[in-house]
């Protein structure tokens, strides 16, 4: 919206009212049409897949749009034109306020009022609210659901484009706008309450005021102030400020699964061949292949730790990097500050991360659905801010350097075998836990918490322990990662790292136990191969979209279906 507005206002005549405001509205309309096109071509095809797949597909769209914007407008920030007739300032209570700021202040309640009227006083709005509550019933009444949801997506995209376009006199346009606003938009919606437009407006006012005055009152907390507010709100009011308790109910992170069963014989043979190939890799491949293999193995363990709570537990975490980075920092600080060897420092990684997950999980498991996911994100951002600002311990943005394995394990081949052994052990332990009574109880709580509790299962406690074990597993991956890279930085606890794990799980398949390994391999190899090309974001985004559309059950889920089908005798039902 911002980029299009800069170009269209220039085209229409930036110095005239018609040129400026016409360019802003035209940019918003173009963005709305592009959003509707994305819904028709991409999202409509995966509505029956797990809901998080839609999030993954939109992430791919973001990568595509980033590279297209880079090609079209270049890497430099664009300065937007000033609004004609609004270049002065107004004095209010002795303070000078830009006139255009008053326009922005007035625009928000006007949009709020328009949306309220649209959703509460029109037939279309009633149908949208009805379809949100029960889509199948609305379809049974003869309403064209596809057209209805395309219109909703157009409206949302139009408003997003309008927001980007209307702010160009103040902020211009740059390539980092998308990721910079996504987290804030999520926070506002969750604090306000899912399904509450008024709640989102109220939350945006609160966050805006805190961001403005927080610099003066709590300068150390400016990095995570909105996440602190979100954490406090969700702990005391899990459905948001103006949301309803029924909106906090989970909508599911996975489709209905068949009962767990041992892997088919063909799959076990394929797994044995893969393990044999991994054991022979140092003798057959060069140093670069070993470095890449170590990264794939470490990220597979990281993704498996997230899958353990997402698949069997039904808990989608948006902040799992807190435990990956926490384990990495624990091992690095034990090595550099305490002088411990890898034999003592590496076990501290899962221990520290497990304790951190135990503390955060106590609050998180009381929530469900997107509220659970956003609270995990809030805690992860708090941990990330500590890593950035506690420079005396963590080194801040400079990180902790010089964390290398000792001579006896320093050879790359030897370290590869250590990583392979620990990752294989972690994956095997995770699989056995899922097939244990603990794992079945966890699945029971995911599928029906009320029934599980009626059977005497303490669902919250099972989920809490699973969350802690998952954090410990992620911490082990972080410890192995820091010794493979020789350093750790706050980026390992950031939002992009958490979303890397989420993408790997979804690409591999939430419903397949082998999904994290397949997803980690696919994502890492794709990123490594495409990052050497000029348009790597575009190609990676298209690859992610293609994989999501081709394998809505995930790569491993698709492979398991094929192997299971081929293993059936001819004529079997």
What is each residue range found by the language model?
Residues 1-11, 37-53, 129, 186-198, ...:
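Single transmembrane alpha-helix segments in multi-pass membrane proteins
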Residues 15-61, 68, 202-207, 234-238, ...:
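Alpha-helical transmembrane segments within multi-pass membrane transporters and channels
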Residues 41, 72, 76, 133-140, ...:
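Cytosolic-side transmembrane-helix boundaries in multi-pass membrane proteins
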Residues 14-23, 49-54, 85, 91-102, ...:
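Membrane-interfacial amphipathic/re-entrant helices at transmembrane-helix boundaries
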Residues 2-6, 28-31, 60-63, 108, ...:
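Residue-level recognition of pore/gate-forming positions within transmembrane alpha-helices
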Residues 46, 54-121, 148, 173, ...:
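Transmembrane helix-bundle core of multi-pass membrane transporters
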Residues 96-173, 197-202, 261-262, 412-489, ...:
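Helix-loop-helix "hairpin" substructures at the membrane interface of multi-pass membrane proteins
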Residues 13-29, 150-236, 321, 346-347, ...:
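Transmembrane alpha-helical segments in multi-pass inner-membrane proteins
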């Amino acid at each position: 919206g911002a980029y299009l507005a800069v170009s269209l206002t220039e085209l229409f005549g930036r110095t005239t009212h018609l040129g400026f405001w016409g360019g802003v509205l035209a940019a918003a309309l173009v963005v709305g049409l592009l959003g509707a096109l994305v819904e028709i071509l991409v999202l409509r095809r995966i509505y029956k897949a797990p809901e998080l797949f839609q999030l993954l597909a939109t992430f791919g769209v973001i990568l595509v749009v980033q590279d297209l914007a880079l090609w079209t407008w270049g890497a430099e920030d664009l300065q937007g034109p000033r609004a004609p007739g609004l270049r002065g300032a107004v004095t209010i209570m002795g303070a000078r306020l830009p006139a255009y700021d008053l326009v922005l202040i007035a625009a928000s309640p006007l949009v709020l009022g328009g949306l309220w009227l649209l959703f509460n006083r029109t037939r279309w709005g009633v149908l949208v609210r009805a379809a949100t509550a029960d889509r199948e019933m609305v379809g049974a009444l003869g309403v064209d659901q596809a057209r209805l949801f395309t219109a909703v997506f157009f409206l949302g995209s139009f408003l997003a484009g309008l927001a980007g376009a209307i702010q160009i006199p103040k902020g211009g346009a740059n390539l980092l706008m998308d990721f910079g606003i996504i987290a804030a938009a999520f926070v506002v919606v969750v604090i306000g309450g899912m399904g509450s437009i008024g709640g989102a407006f109220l939350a945006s006012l609160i966050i805006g005021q805190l961001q403005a005055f927080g610099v003066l009152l709590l300068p150390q907390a400016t990095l995570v102030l909105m996440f602190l507010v979100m954490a406090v709100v969700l702990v005391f009011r899990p459905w948001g400020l103006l949301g309803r308790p029924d909106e906090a109910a989970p909508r599911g992170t996975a489709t209905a699964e068949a009962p767990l069963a041992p892997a088919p014989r063909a799959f076990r043979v394929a797994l044995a061949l893969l393990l044999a190939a991994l054991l022979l890799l140092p003798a057959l491949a060069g140093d670069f292949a070993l470095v890449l293999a170590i990264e794939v193995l470490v990220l597979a363990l990281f993704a498996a730790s997230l899958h353990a709570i997402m698949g069997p537990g039904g808990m989608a975490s948006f902040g799992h990097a807190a435990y990956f980075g926490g384990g990495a920092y624990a091992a690095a600080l034990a090595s550099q500050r305490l002088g411990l060897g890898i034999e003592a420092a590496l076990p501290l990684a899962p221990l520290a991360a497990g304790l951190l997950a135990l503390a955060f999980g106590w609050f998180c498991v009381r929530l469900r659905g997107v509220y659970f996911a956003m609270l995990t994100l809030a805690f992860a951002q708090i941990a990330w801010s500590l890593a950035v600002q506690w420079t005396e311990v963590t080194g801040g943005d400079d990180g902790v350097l010089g964390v290398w394995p000792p001579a006896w394990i320093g050879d790359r081949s030897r370290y590869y075998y250590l990583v392979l052994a620990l990752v294989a052990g972690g994956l095997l332990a995770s699989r056995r836990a899922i097939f244990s009574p603990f794992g079945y109880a966890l699945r029971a709580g995911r599928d029906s918490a009320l029934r599980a509790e009626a059977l005497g299962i303490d669902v919250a406690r099972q989920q809490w322990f699973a969350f802690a074990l998952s954090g410990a597993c992620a911490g082990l991956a972080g410890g192995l990662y820091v010794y493979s890279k020789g350093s750790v930085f706050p980026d390992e606890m950031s939002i992009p790292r958490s979303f890397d794990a989420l993408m790997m799980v979804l690409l591999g398949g939430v419903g397949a136990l082998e999904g994290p390994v397949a997803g980690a391999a696919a994502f890492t190899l794709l990123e490594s191969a495409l990052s050497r090309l000029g348009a790597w974001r575009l190609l990676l985004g298209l690859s992610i979209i293609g994989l999501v559309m081709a394998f809505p059950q995930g790569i491993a889920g698709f492979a398991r279906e094929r192997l299971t089908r081929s293993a059936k005798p001819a004529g079997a039902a």
